[in-house]
Amino acid sequence: MQTNPNMFLNRELSWLRFNSRVLDQCSRPLPLLERLKFVAIYCTNLDEFYMIRVAGLKQLFSAGVNISSSDEMSPLQQLKAIRKYLHKEKDLLEHYFNEIISDLEKENLFIKNYENLDNNLKQKVYEYFFSTIFPVIVPIAVDATHPFPHLNNLSFSLAVNICDNTHPELIKFGMIRIPRVLPRFYEVSANVYVPIESIVEKHTEEIFPGYKLLTSAAFRVTRNADMVIEEEEADDFMMILEQGLKLRRKGAFVRLQIQKGADEQIVEFLNTHMKIFHKDVYEYSILLNLPSLWQIAGNKTFTHLLSPLYTPKTLPPFDENLSIFDAIDKEDILIIQPFESFDPVYKFIKEASKDPEVISIRMTLYRVEKNSNIVQALIGAASAGIQVTVMVELKARFDEENNLHWAKALENAGAHVIYGITGFKVHAKVSQVIRKKGDKLKFYMHLSTGNYNASSAKIYTDVSYFTSKVEFARDTTSFFHILSGFSKNRRLQTLSMSPNQIKEKILEMIALEASKGSEGVIIAKMNSLVDSDIIKALYEASIKGTQIDLIVRGIFCLKPNEEFSKNILVRSIIGKYLEHARVFYFKHSEPNYFISSADWMPRNLERRLELMTPIYDERSKAKLAQFLRLQLSDNLLAYELQNDGEYAKVASNEKVIDSQQILEEYVSKIYKTLKKDTDQSRATHLASKLFKEN
């Protein structure tokens, strides 16, 4: 099939549509603080989009690049389309925010500016200002002797026009930087939050004594946060990375967010110094710095405004009284998080770190939390003399500093730490434990679609797979050898690895289903689909009658076309859990189920080390089948791609199906049923049976 730009949706505009679906959650009949969370998530997503994607397009435009995407939109065309889209959507964001705040007030939860407080609360704010804010804020004069200051990425400040009390004709421009150590809101009482800029503005004349405040405007800046590291020229990669992180703080300004109605002189002054294109200036009639709304959304006093808290469950064959290695010896085990608990993953490493029979632990780390029990267990194992090898991906965007910290801690404990492979990111999620069993060695593996991160495991849907099969032992050993040594043969036998194998394998399996015509079936769940070769292969399969169901949460570049895609159904699921699992089903392949760390994107398939894992175990395959079937039945959280490239909520007059809530209920039901069953084999069989029946 000839490549045609009309086959593809634009990557950046597709991402914007995804983020619009996130914002659309604010229109759902959710508890109010849950709706507020989606405002915060939407704005956080948009920050990163501007820092990386928009910044990248600006660089391409400056370099004179005319074509940069499969749909052949130039960088300038994309920038214009992005700005038009976001300026229009800003009105919708303001509408939802005002609606939610108004509804919160009916529930007696308020965000109030200083002037709207009663005298008692004003006195508390006054005391808070002088005890907590005044000592750490940074007042800045800007004039001939005071240059324009450095503003950190996503920094939040107050710009002021002030005049000399004795010479009012002398007008000065100043800024007050608000440090991130200060909370975005001051919780002046159990139900009242005061925006910090409102407090600072009220006390401007104490901050600039002898001057009178004329006008003020809160503003927030976004910088280019992409980081290019010349790995080939680096003798000390860790040092080069640390230097890169310092340079990132000085990235070019790419966006200015400012209060609507700000004095024209203030806006002009900021623009003059930051040189931001006027279409990248966004004026808001609502509060700025909305990612910080998590502070209010986490209010424990108003639990009735939150969704009921779900506690992930550990199901058989895992048992707190049974060694995790004994459980894996009996059978392969697949768990679906966060409905099932992440605890077995932690226990896998924790138990290995204390087991005298364990001689080696190998693991990849991409994103870990700041206080990681898993990394602490690895440190303990290394300190105890176990051979610990850890691949810490120092290039994991926005986690570089945290990963640097853990890499140093692991090295200090005696672990062998690998920083990555030149020119690639290591995105695979895999760990391997080697134990002595008599005079032989036994290998245990964990392969996953998600990170070794207990925090994200509570809010991301992912699939984990535990096995002790010999073929997985061989391939994971080879994979870690590739990471730690030199290897030109980057191919595995049972697992598939990128950059050499995964795309090749996927194209082979698509071609096989296409050869079966209307008997062919493909179901693929992932975060994003961008790769043009795979898109063309899916078109060809659809033309031949293959039924293709794609569950893609985020970016989706296959353009609907009656001629090419009539047998392709595309849906995106947005709910309280972020859909992060990659699960693939190809009816006529053997095996026919796979999980993977890789999305179908060029970066994953060509510029990262990823793994795709075949699932042979019948119970695990049945579990994945039910998982995919449930997602395809969802008519509450699901959106379907329309012929015009837009998404619409799934229309249905049938019983409401919320795939995430149903999984919570099913797992809870199984857990409750099995809680008192002490017969491990019966409990395991019943768990599998209940899951399949439900």
UniProtKB/Swiss-Prot annotation:
Coiled-coil ranges from the UniProt annotation: none
Transmembrane regions: none
Gene source species: Campylobacter coli
Alphabetized PANTHER family for the sequence: POLYPHOSPHATE KINASE (PTHR30218:SF0)
Cofactor: Mg(2+)
Family matches, as InterPro entries: PP_kinase, PP_kinase_C_1, PP_kinase_middle, PP_kinase_middle_dom_sf, PPK_C_dom2, PPK_N_dom, PPK_N_dom_sf
Keywords recorded for this protein, A-Z: ATP-binding, Kinase, Magnesium, Metal-binding, Nucleotide-binding, Phosphoprotein, Transferase
Ligand binding (ATP): 45, 460, 553, 580
Binding site for Mg(2+): 367, 397
A molecular function GO annotation: polyphosphate kinase activity
Cleaved signal peptide residues: none
EC nos: 2.7.4.1
Protein name: Polyphosphate kinase
